[in-house]
Amino acid sequence: MQRIREVAHRSIPKGGHAHLYGSYARGDAHQGSDWDILILLDKDNLEQTDFDQVSYPFILLGCDIGEEINPIMYTKKEWESYKITPFYENVTRDSINLV
Protein backbone atom coordinates (compact mmCIF):
# COMPACT_ATOMS: atom_id res chain seq x y z
CA MET A 1 0.00 0.00 0.00
CA GLN A 2 2.87 2.39 0.78
CA ARG A 3 4.26 2.14 -2.77
CA ILE A 4 0.81 2.75 -4.22
CA ARG A 5 0.53 5.90 -2.10
CA GLU A 6 3.96 7.03 -3.29
CA VAL A 7 2.97 6.60 -6.93
CA ALA A 8 -0.28 8.47 -6.25
CA HIS A 9 1.58 11.40 -4.68
CA ARG A 10 4.00 11.56 -7.62
CA SER A 11 1.46 11.06 -10.40
CA ILE A 12 -1.76 12.80 -9.40
CA PRO A 13 -1.73 16.48 -10.43
CA LYS A 14 -2.83 19.30 -8.14
CA GLY A 15 -6.57 19.21 -7.54
CA GLY A 16 -6.80 15.51 -8.37
CA HIS A 17 -7.57 12.59 -6.08
CA ALA A 18 -6.85 8.88 -5.94
CA HIS A 19 -8.84 6.32 -3.96
CA LEU A 20 -8.28 2.65 -3.29
CA TYR A 21 -11.56 0.73 -3.51
CA GLY A 22 -12.64 -2.88 -3.75
CA SER A 23 -11.41 -5.84 -1.73
CA TYR A 24 -8.18 -4.25 -0.49
CA ALA A 25 -10.08 -1.20 0.76
CA ARG A 26 -12.72 -3.38 2.45
CA GLY A 27 -10.10 -5.62 4.02
CA ASP A 28 -11.33 -8.83 2.40
CA ALA A 29 -8.64 -9.27 -0.25
CA HIS A 30 -7.25 -12.74 -0.86
CA GLN A 31 -4.37 -14.16 -2.84
CA GLY A 32 -4.95 -13.13 -6.43
CA SER A 33 -7.04 -10.06 -5.60
CA ASP A 34 -6.29 -7.01 -7.69
CA TRP A 35 -5.80 -3.44 -6.50
CA ASP A 36 -8.55 -1.10 -7.72
CA ILE A 37 -7.62 2.57 -7.95
CA LEU A 38 -10.06 5.37 -8.79
CA ILE A 39 -8.36 8.51 -10.12
CA LEU A 40 -10.29 11.77 -10.34
CA LEU A 41 -8.81 14.73 -12.20
CA ASP A 42 -9.90 18.33 -11.87
CA LYS A 43 -10.21 19.17 -15.56
CA ASP A 44 -12.86 19.29 -18.27
CA ASN A 45 -11.66 16.39 -20.42
CA LEU A 46 -9.16 13.57 -20.16
CA GLU A 47 -6.36 13.47 -22.70
CA GLN A 48 -3.96 10.72 -23.75
CA THR A 49 -1.19 12.37 -21.74
CA ASP A 50 -3.32 11.92 -18.59
CA PHE A 51 -3.32 8.17 -19.12
CA ASP A 52 0.41 8.16 -19.87
CA GLN A 53 1.42 10.35 -16.93
CA VAL A 54 -1.21 9.55 -14.31
CA SER A 55 -2.61 6.03 -14.64
CA TYR A 56 0.27 4.24 -16.39
CA PRO A 57 2.66 4.60 -13.41
CA PHE A 58 0.23 2.45 -11.37
CA ILE A 59 0.33 -0.26 -14.03
CA LEU A 60 4.14 -0.15 -14.06
CA LEU A 61 4.20 -0.47 -10.28
CA GLY A 62 1.98 -3.54 -10.53
CA CYS A 63 4.44 -5.14 -12.95
CA ASP A 64 7.28 -4.20 -10.62
CA ILE A 65 5.74 -5.80 -7.53
CA GLY A 66 3.97 -8.71 -9.23
CA GLU A 67 0.46 -7.47 -8.43
CA GLU A 68 -2.41 -6.48 -10.70
CA ILE A 69 -3.22 -2.79 -10.27
CA ASN A 70 -6.25 -1.50 -12.17
CA PRO A 71 -6.51 2.27 -12.30
CA ILE A 72 -9.65 3.85 -13.71
CA MET A 73 -9.74 7.56 -14.34
CA TYR A 74 -12.51 10.13 -14.67
CA THR A 75 -12.82 13.86 -14.52
CA LYS A 76 -14.52 14.99 -11.33
CA LYS A 77 -17.52 16.07 -13.41
CA GLU A 78 -17.77 12.64 -15.07
CA TRP A 79 -17.55 10.94 -11.67
CA GLU A 80 -20.40 13.06 -10.32
CA SER A 81 -22.62 11.75 -13.12
CA TYR A 82 -22.24 8.26 -11.59
CA LYS A 83 -23.87 9.33 -8.30
CA ILE A 84 -27.00 7.32 -9.00
CA THR A 85 -25.13 4.06 -9.61
CA PRO A 86 -24.32 1.23 -7.19
CA PHE A 87 -20.68 1.50 -8.28
CA TYR A 88 -20.50 5.11 -7.02
CA GLU A 89 -22.15 4.12 -3.74
CA ASN A 90 -19.76 1.20 -3.20
CA VAL A 91 -16.66 3.25 -3.95
CA THR A 92 -17.85 6.14 -1.79
CA ARG A 93 -18.65 3.82 1.11
CA ASP A 94 -15.57 1.60 1.01
CA SER A 95 -12.74 3.63 -0.48
CA ILE A 96 -9.50 4.72 1.16
CA ASN A 97 -8.15 8.11 0.13
CA LEU A 98 -4.62 7.86 -1.28
CA VAL A 99 -4.13 11.50 -2.23
Walk through the language-model features, giving the residues of each.
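Catalytic core of pol beta-like nucleotidyltransferases
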Residues: 1-19, 25-31, 42-99
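Short beta-strand->loop micro-motif that forms the acidic, two-metal-ion catalytic signature
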Residues: 35-40
